[in-house]
């Protein structure tokens, strides 16, 4: 006979790895071409002037300049790069 109870199991003992999403370059900061400005799931914020969109919806700078967030058409958020 066992002298200790069985350990049992749980269905909750795991956690996903962090994804490090969010804004990487704040509005008003200067960036170089290729710098990641924002990592996101889906296109909550769309790329504007001089900003590109990666296949995982990452927004990055296409030119050297200053980051500028604004509300675009239909009040959708956009990120522009104002060339320096």
From Swiss-Prot:
Ribosomal protein as UniProt keyword: yes
GO molecular function, one term: structural constituent of ribosome
Keywords, comma-separated and alphabetical: Ribonucleoprotein, Ribosomal protein
Gene Ontology cellular component annotations, sorted alphabetically: ribonucleoprotein complex; ribosome
Keyword Nucleotide-binding: no
Gene from which the chain derives: rpmA
Cysteines paired by S-S bonds: none
Top-level taxonomy: Bacteria, Pseudomonadati, Chlorobiota, Chlorobiia, Chlorobiales
Location of region: Disordered: 1-21
Entry-linked PROSITE patterns: RIBOSOMAL_L27
Family of the protein in this entry: Belongs to the bacterial ribosomal protein bL27 family.
Protein name from the UniProt record: Large ribosomal subunit protein bL27
One annotated GO biological process: translation
Native source species: Chlorobaculum parvum (strain DSM 263 / NCIMB 8327)
């Amino acid at each position: 006979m066992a002298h200790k109870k069985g350990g049992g199991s749980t269905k909750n003992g795991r956690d996903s790895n962090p994804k490090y999403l969010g804004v990487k370059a704040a509005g008003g900061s200067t960036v170089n071409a290729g710098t990641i400005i924002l990592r996101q799931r889906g296109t909550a914020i769309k790329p504007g002037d001089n900003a590109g969109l990666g296949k995982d919806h990452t927004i990055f700078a296409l030119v050297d300049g200053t980051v500028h967030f604004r509300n675009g058409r239909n009040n959708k958020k956009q990120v522009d790069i104002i060339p320096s």
